[in-house]
Design a protein with these regions (language model features):
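Interfacial aromatic "cap" segments that immediately flank transmembrane helices
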Residues: 12-45, 95-124, 136-187, 224-227
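Short, contiguous pre-domain boundary segments
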Residues: 1-13
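Selective recognition of hydrophobic, aromatic-rich stretches within alpha-helical transmembrane segments
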Residues: 12, 60-92, 119-159, 186-218
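Juxtamembrane "helix exit" motif at the C-terminal ends of alpha-helical transmembrane segments
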Residues: 44-57, 187
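Short, charged juxtamembrane terminal tails flanking transmembrane helices
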Residues: 2-5, 212-227
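Alpha-helical hydrophobic membrane-insertion segments
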Residues: 33, 41, 45-47, 60-70
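Membrane-interface helix-boundary signature
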Residues: 58-64, 168, 172
């Protein structure tokens, strides 16, 4: 399925860890206010998923926990996919609007099921051994973008993410690995620092997807590392 959402003046990138973070940092300041507002709204929408911790008593906590789980699947999951799409639009230099964070609702059930399936696959991998879980997480990292950006069905998005990350999965891993010291540095700068760090990391992931998607360099074999 062709991607009709990319604008002609989109940022051109070569897939790489360094280029992804460089573009993420550059676009962060260009779209800071819009992304900040989207992040705040997304955070508020996600608050009910932890509501089982608000009450005492096993029964009440259990009921609220179940409701929070359902809410997380049906509401927060699609919203988080929409937030990822908003970061993608910023990463490639497109016009960003608050409503972009709700874009996943245009492909609602595929977003719900994709979020659920990917989560289950990663958990199974982590339960078996930590390494398979990490591999699954890296190979399926592009699924949210594909579901929202290209309006793909669940299995189509999962298969395409697996294909696209061939030769690039290690880059997804190192972007995630570098996120650890970046977020630690952000914590040292308190609230403002961690917000900037998280936004930069999300933009880096989105930048890598955009680079791989637009360059046609996705392959089924591992490539030579480039930064």
């Amino acid at each position: 399925m062709q991607n009709n959402n990319v604008q002609k003046n989109s940022v051109t990138l070569v897939p790489g860890v360094g280029s992804a973070y460089k573009n993420g940092w550059r676009q962060l300041w260009k779209y800071f206010l819009g992304l900040f507002l989207i992040g705040i709204i997304g955070f508020i929408i996600g608050i009910p998923t932890g509501m089982n911790e608000w009450v005492q008593g096993a029964t009440a906590a259990g009921i609220l926990g179940f409701l929070a789980f359902i809410y997380g699947i049906l509401v927060e999951g699609p919203v988080q996919y929409g937030v990822a799409f908003a970061f993608l639009k910023a990463a490639r230099g497109d016009k960003l609007e608050i409503k972009d964070m709700f874009e996943a609702f245009k492909n609602y059930w595929n977003a719900v099921l994709a979020s659920l399936f990917v989560g289950v696959i990663i958990v199974i991998g982590l339960v078996l051994l930590i390494v398979p879980g990490i591999i699954f997480a890296c190979k399926l990292a592009f699924t949210p973008y594909l579901v929202v950006d290209r309006k793909m069905a669940v299995m189509e998005a999962i298969e395409e993410s697996w294909r696209m990350t061939g030769g690039h999965a290690w880059k997804v891993f190192f972007i995630g690995l570098l996120a650890i010291p970046i977020c630690i540095a952000g914590l040292l700068c308190f609230i403002v620092g961690i917000i900037i760090s998280l936004m930069c990391v999300n933009l880096a992931f989105a930048s890598l997807y955009h680079a791989v998607s637009s360059s046609g360099m996705a392959s089924v074999q591992e490539g030579v590392p480039t930064t």
